[in-house]
């Protein structure tokens, strides 16, 4: 199901003042945004659609505001007057604590975190001088119980003690902050996080739940930022896959297992592949909670896995959910050679989806659906079902 598409325009003060241009289409009515995205998708996939062969289902949408579950805040200003937000096009430090994309409880917590930085006396990192400590605050919200994962990205270990001293007061005020960690990123470059993660709480993962499937978020594991539409994306994948009644299933670029765990049953042999070990750990915990025994998750490169000896047993159906770069020609060739009944391709970049479709041989599109996980931007997710000729 989709939310009713209202032909209204959201009013954002940040955008109107020229302080933030991230939602570049926020002044375009939602119905018009969806029409433009749908047209772009149809044009990109037109070369791969035989007449009357593929069905383009109506776009799936959610709320236009208060939908986002993750905030990535640059920490600016000074220790006595910190600012959580971005640097505007004019070079101004702009607080984004009241961004319309965040739920109201998240906005409130972001304001409290600004106060926390000030009270703890943590100096924000100054890019122009390569001095200071606190680079980013990353906040992730679970819709299950409104719990949070909070990360402080620091240049060094020097301010950890300041955070630890101030943390008990914050956690007493906000017991819904379930996980707190410090990430050390010492490099003077525009890199969001470093290799070292230090947990300041006993809990190390945040629970989320889509369609009664338990999923877990750790600091470095990828997770969809629009829970409402993501739940519909996973449910649609489950329904499309069930039509083929596969006995074996691969979930490549599986992340925390969202697609594979939605599609798996106790009778389906599921193999999930993901390069990030933290995500694989989360996926395995979910599988155990669901009582799935014919499941294996491995921290490997998906292309390397498909070309290696572990891929000897060919599955009935393959799911791919790659990053924006797509799956690449080598993996396209491997999928063509495996010749499963069907390939379910979830793409966050329709341009690379179209490029990959040029290299997947022996398949035709039967279903395509757009999921608008990123309102007011040019980005969207696509679910495409390819069936063996």
Swiss-Prot record:
Does the keyword S-adenosyl-L-methionine belong to this entry? Answer: yes
Binding residues for S-adenosyl-L-methionine: 224, 253, 274, 321
Catalysed reaction(s) here are: uridine(747) in 23S rRNA + S-adenosyl-L-methionine = 5-methyluridine(747) in 23S rRNA + S-adenosyl-L-homocysteine + H(+)
GO terms under biological process: rRNA base methylation
Provide the GO MF annotations for this entry: 4 iron, 4 sulfur cluster binding; iron ion binding; rRNA (uridine-C5-)-methyltransferase activity
Alphabetically sorted, this entry's keywords are: 4Fe-4S, Iron, Iron-sulfur, Metal-binding, Methyltransferase, rRNA processing, S-adenosyl-L-methionine, Transferase
EC number(s) stated in the UniProt entry for this protein: 2.1.1.189
Residues at the active site? 348 (nucleophile)
Q: Which residues bind [4Fe-4S] cluster?
A: 12, 20, 23, 99
Pfam families recorded for this chain? Answer: tRNA_U5-meth_tr
- What is the annotated role of this protein in its UniProt record? Catalyzes the formation of 5-methyl-uridine at position 747 (m5U747) in 23S rRNA.
UniProt lists the family membership as follows: Belongs to the class I-like SAM-binding methyltransferase superfamily. RNA M5U methyltransferase family. RlmC subfamily.
- Cross-referenced HAMAP family: 23SrRNA_methyltr_RlmC
Q: What is this protein called?
A: 23S rRNA (uracil(747)-C(5))-methyltransferase RlmC
The lineage is: Bacteria, Pseudomonadati, Pseudomonadota, Gammaproteobacteria, Alteromonadales
Gene that encodes the chain:
rlmC
């Amino acid at each position: 199901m989709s939310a009713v598409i209202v032909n209204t325009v959201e009013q954002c003060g940040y955008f109107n003042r020229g302080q933030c241009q991230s939602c570049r289409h926020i002044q375009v009515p939602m119905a018009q945004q969806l029409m433009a995205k749908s047209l772009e998708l149809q044009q990109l996939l037109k070369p791969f659609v035989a007449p009357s062969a593929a069905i383009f289902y109506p776009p799936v949408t959610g709320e236009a505001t208060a939908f986002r579950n993750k905030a990535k805040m640059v920490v600016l200003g000074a220790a006595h007057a910190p600012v959580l937000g971005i640097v505007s096009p004019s070079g101004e430090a702009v607080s984004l604590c009241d961004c319309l994309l965040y739920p109201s409880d998240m906005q409130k917590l972001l304001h409290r975190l600004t106060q926390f930085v000030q009270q703890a006396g943590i100096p924000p990192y100054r890019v122009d001088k390569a001095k200071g400590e606190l680079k980013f605050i990353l906040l992730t919200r679970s819709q299950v119980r409104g719990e949070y994962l909070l990360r402080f990205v620091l240049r060094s270990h020097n301010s950890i003690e300041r955070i630890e001293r101030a943390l008990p007061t914050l956690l007493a005020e906000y017991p819904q902050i379930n996980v707190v960690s410090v990430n050390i990123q010492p490099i003077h470059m525009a890199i969001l996080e470093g290799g070292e993660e230090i947990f300041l709480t006993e809990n190390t993962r945040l629970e989320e739940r889509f369609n009664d499937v338990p999923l877990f978020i750790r600091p470095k594991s990828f997770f969809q930022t629009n829970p409402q539409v993501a739940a519909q994306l996973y449910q649609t994948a489950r329904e499309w896959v069930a039509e083929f009644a596969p006995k074996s299933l691969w979930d490549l670029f599986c992340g925390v297992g969202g697609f594979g765990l939605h599609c798996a049953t106790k009778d389906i042999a599921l193999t999930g592949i993901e390069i990030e070990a933290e995500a694989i750990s989360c996926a395995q915990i979910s599988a155990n909670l669901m009582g799935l025994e014919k499941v294996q998750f491995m921290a490997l490169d998906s292309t390397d896995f498909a070309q290696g000896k572990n891929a000897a047993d060919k599955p009935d159906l393959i799911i791919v959910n790659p990053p924006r770069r797509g799956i690449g020609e080598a993996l396209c060739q491997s999928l063509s050679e495996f010749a499963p009944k069907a390939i379910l391709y979830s793409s966050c970049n329709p341009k690379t989806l179209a490029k990959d479709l040029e290299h997947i041989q022996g398949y035709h599109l039967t279903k395509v659906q757009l999921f608008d996980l990123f309102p007011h931007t040019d980005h969207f997710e696509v679910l495409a079902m390819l069936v063996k000729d």
